[in-house]
Amino acid sequence: MTTVSSDRIRIKLKAYDYRILDKAVAEIVDTARNTGAGVAGPIPLPTNIHKYTIQRSVHVDKKSREQFEMRIHKRLMDILEPTQQTVDALGKLSLPAGVDVEIKL
């Protein structure tokens, strides 16, 4: 009996900049389709937003504050029925810096 996990590769991508994230997704989709595998996604996952509030001055002016935020964009993809060529091509793929990749087989 075959399991579902061997019939697909689940890829989760994270980045601070959505533009480089979309470029990385496009490279993975092109690579998977060129090797004959199907692609489901990319599915945009909710963006994590971390907000930080700090005082502008060190000693006085409590009312004067500055706010910063950090956004983490995420995408989820499934590569359906991957071949050995697909796995090799994904292993050799160089993605832009700043993109975190999680692969589950």
Curated annotation (Swiss-Prot):
This is Small ribosomal subunit protein uS10. The keyword Ribosomal protein applies. Keywords: Ribonucleoprotein, Ribosomal protein. InterPro entries: Ribosomal_uS10 (IPR001848), Ribosomal_uS10_CS (IPR018268), Ribosomal_uS10_dom (IPR027486), Ribosomal_uS10_dom_sf (IPR036838). It comes from the Bacteria. GO terms for cellular component: ribonucleoprotein complex; ribosome. Belongs to the universal ribosomal protein uS10 family. Part of the 30S ribosomal subunit. One of its GO terms (molecular function) is structural constituent of ribosome. PANTHER family: 30S RIBOSOMAL PROTEIN S10 FAMILY MEMBER (PTHR11700).
